[in-house]
Amino acid sequence: MTCVVAIDVGGTTLKGGLIAPDGAILHRERRPTPRTEGPDRVIAAISAFVADLSRPRTVAGTLLRPAAVGLAVPGLVTSEKAVFSAAFGWRDVPAAAFSDGRLPLALGHDVRSAGEAELAHGPGAADALYLPIGTGIAGAVVLSVSLYGGAAGWAGQIGHIPVRPGGLPCPCGQRGCLAAYASAASIAARAGETTAEDVVRRAAAGDEPAARVWAEAVEALALALATYTLVLDPAMIVIGGGLSLAGDALVAPLRARLAARLTFRPAPEVRVSALGVDAGLLGAGLLARRALGQQGGGDVDDLGA
């Protein structure tokens, strides 16, 4: 069976998979992201992962033959290069750096690709925001059932909206960014925990320091999302990424705080992603299928056995 390679690059984990023509995930692998070892080490790890997944393999008795690669990465991204990533210290890394050239590779923004998968999966809204929250925060802006990239393709950098001017430093160079207060990584770090999940658990058990960090994160999210709502009027805000696993512990207070800030109009619906943590991987699969079509290998629906 012909398939595509999909890799979703996260701040802590590289999620890889082989995706069937119908979008089913046939094979999964995860590897740690060596973020603390420097920009070049992350590029090398991604390149090795691409090479390994690009080899034919037999899964459940079926020979899988990868035909293209989709690579979804964080930061400011074009189809030709990763322009900037605060998480990895990248500047102007060409797409070719992630591959040996054996298969066509499509590079795309992780959140926008995940948003495209979420939009394709449905049901959704004609005007919405897909907001995965993990190591960082960025959004996929959906306007009139289409993803909106902006003038340079960089729309949706919600994680760098200042919610506390002069506040905590952010790797982007600003202070007081939303990501400095409400990303999963910042929540864990500020509460002295390994993961945001640990902070949620402590807060639910009545631990005051953890509850304070969690409340500040929710308030920061509500402030940024109120600003977004007043500008673009979404019908729905979809929370994804690792922090979405908090479920009602996140969604319930966020709905309440968002409604409290939008004093003269109703708040948009806030819900958790239907695709969960697979949205990024499936979005990378869509990138790969597009690359295959551009190489003359067929459209997304033309991949055959």
Model-derived regions, located:
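Glycine-rich phosphate-binding loop and adjoining helix at the ATP-binding site
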Residues: 34, 39-47, 51, 62-129, ...
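Adenine-nucleotide phosphate-binding core of ATP-dependent small-molecule kinases
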Residues: 35-55, 59-61, 180, 186-238, ...
